[in-house]
Amino acid sequence: MMTIEQLGQRAKVASRALVSLTTKDKNQFLAFLAEELVAQTDMILAENAKDLAKAAEHGISEIMCDRLRLTADRIHAMAHGVRQVADLADPIGEVIKGYTNLDGLKITQKRVPLGVIAMIFESRPNVSIDAFSLAFKTNNAIILRGGKDALYSNMALVKLVRNALEASAITPDAVQLIEDTSHAVAEELMQATDYIDVLIPRGGARLIQTVKEKAKVPVIETGVGNVHIYVDEAADLEMAVKVVINAKTQRPSVCNAAESLIIHEKVGATFIPMLEAAISKVQQVEWRADEQAKALFSKAVLATEEDYAAEFLDYIMSVHLVSSLDEAISWINQYTSHHSEAIITANINAAERFQDLVDSAAVYVNASTRFTDGFVFGLGAEIGISTQKMHARGPMGLEALTSSKYLINGNGQIRS
C-alpha cells in the first residue's frame, strides 16, 4: 500500500501530463468510461453487496444504507452523469478577459486546472465517479479517500476507471484511491502541502470540523445541511404542505433535505394539523418543537438547543414559531449551516427580503430545497456543495475546479 507522499508524487506527475489533453481527448474518454460503467454493472453490484453486508453486521440504519447502496438504476445514472460532463463546455483554456495596457503589453487571463485535488468523502460510492469525471474534464488529477463503509465499492469503481485510462493510453494516476481508511492517514493527506492544491471534504459535521481543524492544505468546505423552510403568514398552505413533505421525506439522508421548519404564528394553528395529517400518510416524522408549536401537534417532543442546529439525516424535524419575517430570517441566520433555505409565501416583498437577507448558498421561494444539486442547476455532476464564500459557493461544477493565470505578451518593453 502506497504512502500519502507516494500517492502525492504520482498525482503531481499525472497532473502535468493531463494538461496536454484536448477537449476531444477528454470527451472521448468520458464516453468510453460511461460505457464501461454500464458494462460492468454486475461486478460493481457484487462489490457493493459486500459493503452492504458489512453495514448490516454493524447495525447501520436503513437510511444510512441507502446512501451506500448502488443499484442498476443508480449505476446507469452515474454513467448518464459522466456523459453529461462530456457534453458540457470545456472551461479549460477559456479567456476570462484580455486587454492591452498603457505599456502596450497584451494581457490575457486564461482559465487553467487547479492541479491535484484531494477529496475525503463518506458513504456514497457514486461520489468516486462524479468527482473523477469533473476533475478529469478540467485536466486535474484527483486523490480519493472514501469511508471504510464503502471501501469495496470505491475500490471497484476506481479500478474500473484506472483500467479504462490505461486502455485509452492516459496515465492511470489521474485517479488514485487511498485504501487505508484510518484517521491518521486522512490527517496526513490534509497536511500534504507539497502535493495537494485543494482538499474538498464531503460528509457530515464531524468530518468537516476535523478538516477545518487539521488541514494545512487549502480547503473548500462543503456539505453539512441544516436546511430551513419558513412558512410565511402569506403562504399558500397547501403548497407549503407539499413542499415540506418533499423536502423532508423524499430522501432524508441527503444534505439538501429539510431539517428545520419555521412557521409564522398566525398560520401555525391551521398549518401544523394540515401538515401532520398529510405527512403521516407518507412517513412518520418525529417533530421536535418549541413549547408553542408543540401544543399544536398531536404528538411532538420538546426541542433542545442542539436540535435547532442539527443535521438529522433522518425522519426528524425541528419546529419553531416566529412572530415576523425578520424574526424568521434572524433565526435561520443563527442556526443555518449556510447550505439551502426556502420561504413559502405569496408576498413578493417578503420573498425578496428573505432572499436578500438569508446568508446561504441557495435561497428558494416557493420550491423544495431538494433542488440544490449540480445536475438540476445544469452543472452536470457536482463535486460537492460549497457552504463557504471564498472561491466557490453552492453546487460546484467544472468552473469551481479551475484557477486562472495571466499570459503577458510584449515586444521588448521594460519598466521605467
UniProtKB/Swiss-Prot annotation:
The keyword Ion transport does not apply. Pathway: Amino-acid biosynthesis; L-proline biosynthesis; L-glutamate 5-semialdehyde from L-glutamate: step 2/2. Gene3D superfamilies: Aldehyde Dehydrogenase, Chain A, domain 1 (3.40.605.10), Aldehyde Dehydrogenase, Chain A, domain 2 (3.40.309.10). It is found in: Cytoplasm. Its EC number is 1.2.1.41. It holds the Pfam family Aldedh. It comes from the Bacteria. It is an enzyme of class 1 (oxidoreductase). NCBIfam families: PRK00197.1, proA. This is Gamma-glutamyl phosphate reductase.
